[in-house]
Amino acid sequence: MLANYHRLKSGVIKQTEVIPFEYNKKYIQDTYDTYGDGRIQMAWLRIGHILGNIGGFDTLLDVGYGNGDFLKAAVKVAQCYGYEINGYEIPEGCTFADDWQEQDVDVMTFFDVLEHIPDLTFMRHLRAKYVVISVPDCLYHSDQWFENWKHRKPNEHIWHFNEDSLTRFMEENGYICMELNNVEDCIRIHHEKNILTGIFKKLTI
């Protein structure tokens, strides 16, 4: 294991010492606003994937909604809430949720978000019936692979998951895995598995 990283019992890899990272509008513009048509395709892919796995739902909360592309699509099928720290206004028809950790919703989504949050202990207290997550898929072939991996971004990406560790992490927090795949790779094309997407159901609600 590389210096300043350690592996948890679940198999999740965590950066040990972290320098706070600033997330603002420029970060979103540089990271996501350059995707062009892929932004809209991704939003509808995500909606379709959720509907295909859990069926219809009434309420959805998107944590870290970025530039709002996903919520602009989701609001067409459900009552939507969102939370973001970067300064982007929430899309029309959606409600900003300052108290997002206390929200009772059918679906809570974390697209490209979980790996950035320094403290994930809040996960065990979520009240959503379903949680949907997309994170970089950390295959960890070797220390050298991990050192050169494009998604190893110290201080920005703090947590690293693969299929097994994400499943165990969510089980520890009261959710069972319904579906786990690399569906977003049809848009985020890469030479190997790139983005891991999981849909999880709360054991008790």
Feature locations, PLM:
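Conserved beta-strand signature within the Rossmann-like core of class I S-adenosyl-L-methionine
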Residues: A128-Y140
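Short glycine-rich, flexible loops that bind phosphorylated cofactors or substrates
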Residues: H116-I117, Y140
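Conserved N-terminal segment of class I S-adenosyl-L-methionine
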Residues: M1-V107, F111, L120-L126, Q144-W149, ...
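Conserved active-site loop/cleft motifs that coordinate metal ions or position small ligands
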Residues: V132-S134, M178-N181
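Histidine-centered active-site/metal-ligand motif
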Residues: H116, H157-H160
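Short glycine-rich hinge loops at helix-strand junctions in the catalytic core
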Residues: G174
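Residues lining the SAM
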Residues: F111-L114, S134
